[in-house]
Structures are given as C-alpha cells and as structure tokens.
Amino acid sequence: MKNNLINMDEINKLIKPIVEELNYELYYIEYVREQNENYLRIYIDSSKGINLEDCEKVSRKVSDILDEKDPISDSYYLEVSSPGIERVLYTEEHLHKYTNNQIIVKLAKLFEGSREHQGNLISFNDDTVTIEKENESINIPRERIKKIILKGEF
C-alpha cells in the first residue's frame, strides 16, 4: 500500500519486527493528515490487552528506528495505541479472526434501507460480507462498505 508521502510497506517492515520482539501484535498502521498535521498511528494488540506502559515501550523503540532510517520526509506525530474494544476491522485477517462476532457495518450509500447494519459476522469473500441480523442473512457488497467495526461487549 503506497501513501503519497511514504511507502507503508517499508514502514511496516521497519515496525513489525520491533513490535513482535516486544511480544505484541502489530494490528494496523496508518499515516493520516488531520488539521494540517501528519500522524503515523500504530495500533498494537495483545491477548492480555494493552496499557499505557505498553504503548510507551513500543513508541520509544519505534521512534528510535524511524529516527535512524528516516523513511518519512515530512514532519509527523507518532501515536501508538490499542485498537480499542470497538476496533475497526481493516484486513482479511481481522475479518477471519472476528468471524462469529457482532460487527457494525458502515456504508457509503443506503443498502436495504440503511447506511449502517449490525449483526453477527458469518462469512466474507472478495465481493461480500455476510452478517446475520434478526435471524436473516444479509450479503453486503464490499464496494459499498466504508468501515467495519467490531461491536464491543460491555
């Protein structure tokens, strides 16, 4: 995946070994521009959960390698955090991991009368994401999906 300013594959190759060496999962990396500032956001996860100290530890190590290799020419803020309880499902791996869990599917356009559908993630393929909603299967075209969020259990 290529960003206008940076090569995300290169960033991933630098960061992933560090995160894994510290016994965390690299959940996702994004480089975004918000309010005229650039942010490199690194989401980490662990079966034990993530706390502030975990984020600080990863941030220090990642910051060192990014300063050394300097893969981003523009100035940016580095943020390390947990993906949260109601996390966005970005990848096929995420969808696979959370199959049979409650999700919220946010859509760009109306589909079956709504821009948001909530249900149990049953399956997915290249074309559709299938959820079970009120004992009915709904096949949602992937090209209409803006975001899929894991529904947190409170």
Swiss-Prot record:
The keyword Cytoplasm applies. Keywords: Cytoplasm, Ribosome biogenesis. This is Ribosome maturation factor RimP. It comes from Clostridium novyi (strain NT). Required for maturation of 30S ribosomal subunits. It holds the Pfam family RimP_N. Belongs to the RimP family. Its main location: cytoplasm.
